[in-house]
Each structure stands twice: as C-alpha cells, then as structure tokens.
Design a protein with these regions (language model features):
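Terminal amphipathic alpha-helical/low-complexity segments used for targeting or macromolecular assembly
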Residues: 1-56, 61
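Structural signal for interior beta-strand "rungs" in well-ordered beta-sheet cores
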Residues: 51-130
C-alpha cells in the first residue's frame, strides 16, 4: 500500500487542494469531502483572480470556458484552465491551473491537478484524483 499513498503518487504543490489532501494518507480517503472543501475554499479566493459565476462556482478570470460548457457547483476552475465545447462538469470538481477539459468530457467529484489534460469524450467521475 506504500505506493498508493498520496505523498508517493502526487506532487501536492501542483494543486489548490494541497492543504486539504495533506490531511489524508490515501487518495480515496479525501474524495467524500471534495464538495465541502470547495464550499469552504471558494469564498476565500482572491476576487481579483476569481469571479463567482453561480452558486458555489468560482472561475479564474484568466480561464477560458466555452459558452456551450455546462458548469454545476461546487466547482473551482483555476487560472489559465480551459473548459472546451460541450464539457459537462456536474459538480464537486476542481480543475487545476493550466489544465484542459476537452470537448464533451464529463467531470464529477474530482480533483484535477495543474497542467493536466483530459482529452475530449472522456468520463472522469465517481471520485477521482487526477
């Protein structure tokens, strides 16, 4: 199980959820609380960098979100991220800095680290840390 520990799998400096994930040994331990974490963190985000776009939805002003993308909170989209056409974000999701969510990709209950590319037509759901 040593290889499955958060500290062995991930560079926590590459996520806005570093402090949150640091509380746990294994990734699956953190997944049930993603929604609550986002609801706590969102209101503390710098309004010069992030804008609130709906109930429990914070999007960095430098992020690109296509008009056809569906966003449902709780959700944080970090700086320079790109949410492409018809992406479907169902909530409890963090999209890291510089990450790309491809067209027609669905996300729910996930933490996407910085600079991750989730290609088009993917389904990242049911509690994932990518």
């Amino acid at each position: 199980m040593e290889n499955a520990k958060i500290t062995n799998l991930y560079n926590l400096d590459e996520t806005i959820a570093k402090e949150y994930l640091s509380q746990f040994t294994y990734p699956w331990e953190a997944l049930a609380g993603i929604s609550d974490f986002i609801k706590e963190l969102g209101p503390t985000l710098d309004p010069e960098i992030y804008e609130k776009r709906g109930e429990d939805i914070w999007v960095a002003k430098s992020a690109t979100v296509f008009d056809s993308a569906y966003l449902h909170g709780p959700l944080i989209i970090c700086e320079d991220a790109e949410i492409r056409q018809c992406a479907f974000i169902r909530g409890s999701a963090i999209v890291g800095k510089g990450s790309v969510v491809g067209n027609s990709t669905e996300l729910k209950n996930v933490i996407i680290f910085n600079s991750v590319q989730v290609p088009h037509y993917n389904y990242v759901d049911r509690k994932s840390v990518v």
